[in-house]
């Protein structure tokens, strides 16, 4: 997936891959072949848009076979490929229907079938689920993932929804201001962000102002505001002159009503707010010397703790990330 805020260049990059835009420098290669100067209609790619672009005046069958009509194939092969495409998207028997007789999810699947029927090497998807409601979007995420696995071709999926990207992707490219900042599997992206933008953009994270005291290989001694000075193992290259923050994911902070729990770091705080989200409770805790309340998530009982209660936060050093403010 290509993931990033609106205007960061995701769709422009997709259009360059498709051949609708020409790169200002560099080349475009697909399956080892340079396609930079090959026009869009001759590239081994197909594109699915957010608005589906289903023709309302022709039925499903003719919509799907539209791209095949300029190819020199027999009507028997065309019918077979249309039937195969409908089977892929689980819409057999819908050949004679028109777009106004289809639900939003069905129209999206017809758009996918029309793209897949030409058997591209790369399928380009430009926020294709953006117009669907939450429940249908989640169902289509699973269907798209299963479809990609069954057809075995590369899907390049553009989205600004981090949850969507993390759910569906083998690899995620995080973009900002026209740059790709990090390309990693979802878990690696979440656990080991390369800079402040990636760490803050992917999921919830507590960011604490910090300064580098000393560096010994991958071991970085940092002074964390309101917490103390600790040696943390860095997962990216950190230099003495880098400006940093330290990051802690909410799931990595444990809360207790007393100081009996063992952890590398224990700090005292006061609960300022709680929010209930299904199976998780988010707890906000203010700590002396820290500008912003720390957020933690827990599936366990708060053990009698409530707003304005004093509490203890327990953190292990392995769960703290040293994050550069500047680009990697």
Q: Across the structure, where does each feature detected by a protein language model lie?
A:
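Helix-to-loop junction immediately C-terminal to a conserved catalytic motif
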Residues: 18
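ATP-binding Walker
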Residues: 8
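ABC ATPase nucleotide-binding domain helices that frame the ATP-binding cleft
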Residues: 11-14, 110
């Amino acid at each position: 997936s290509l993931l990033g805020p609106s205007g960061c260049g995701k769709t422009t990059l997709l259009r360059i891959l498709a051949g609708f835009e020409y790169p200002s420098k560099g080349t475009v290669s697909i399956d080892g072949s340079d396609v930079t100067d090959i026009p869009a209609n001759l590239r081994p790619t197909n594109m699915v848009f957010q608005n589906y672009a289903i023709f309302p005046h022709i039925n499903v069958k003719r919509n799907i076979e539209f791209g095949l009509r300029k190819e020199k194939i027999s009507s028997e092969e065309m019918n077979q490929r249309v039937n195969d495409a409908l089977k892929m998207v689980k819409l057999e028997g819908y050949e004679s229907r028109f777009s106004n007789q289809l639900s939003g999810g069905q129209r999206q699947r017809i758009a996918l079938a029309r793209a897949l029927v030409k058997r591209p090497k790369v399928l380009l998807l430009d926020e294709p689920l953006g117009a669907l409601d939450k429940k249908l979007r989640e169902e289509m995420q699973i269907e798209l993932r299963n479809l990609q696995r069954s057809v075995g071709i590369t899907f390049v999926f553009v989205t600004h929804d981090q949850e969507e990207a993390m759910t569906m992707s083998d690899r995620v490219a995080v973009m900002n201001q026209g740059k790709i900042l990090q390309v990693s599997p979802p878990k690696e992206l979440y656990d080991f962000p390369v800079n402040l933008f990636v760490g803050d953009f992917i999921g919830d994270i507590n960011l604490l102002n910090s300064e580098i005291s000393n560096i010994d290989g991958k071991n970085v001694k940092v002074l964390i505001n309101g917490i103390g000075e600790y040696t943390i193992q860095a997962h990216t290259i950190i230099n003495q002159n880098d400006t940093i923050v330290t990051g802690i994911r909410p799931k990595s902070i444990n809360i207790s009503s007393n100081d009996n729990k063992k952890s590398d770091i224990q700090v005292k705080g006061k609960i300022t707010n709680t929010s209930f989200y299904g199976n998780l409770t988010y707890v906000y805790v203010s700590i002396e010397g820290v500008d912003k309340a720390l957020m933690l998530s827990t599936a366990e009982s708060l053990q009698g703790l409530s707003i304005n209660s004093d509490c203890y936060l327990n953190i292990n050093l392995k769960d703290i990330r040293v994050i550069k403010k500047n680009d990697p």
